[in-house]
Curated annotation (Swiss-Prot):
It is found in: Mitochondrion inner membrane. GO terms for cellular component: mitochondrial inner membrane. This is Mitochondrial import inner membrane translocase subunit Tim9. SUPFAM superfamilies: Tim10-like (SSF144122). It comes from the Eukaryota. Belongs to the small Tim family. It comes from Zygosaccharomyces bailii. A motif (Twin CX3C motif) lies at residues 35-59. The keyword Nuclease does not apply. The gene is TIM9. Its main location: mitochondrion. Pfam families: zf-Tim10_DDP.
Amino acid sequence: MDSLNPREQQEFSKLIEHKQMKDFMRLYSNLVERCFTDCVNDFTSSKLTSKEQTCISRCSEKFLKHSERVGLRFQEQNAAMGQGLGR
């Protein structure tokens, strides 16, 4: 990134921010869809039952922990690949 001029650096930063936002929105959408599908079964009321609320809390926590673990594994893999290239 050092070889880019200030304008190019700014454009590159905007691209990175856009991609990060897009990735976050995809993660959020997947979370909502999955937990809603798995947990919400009763459409006779406009409110969630306590069972549905508990299910959604557990589902979202599990989903986010899984996503975090996957991200960490990718970081570890990238670090290992970087070390292998540095030799």
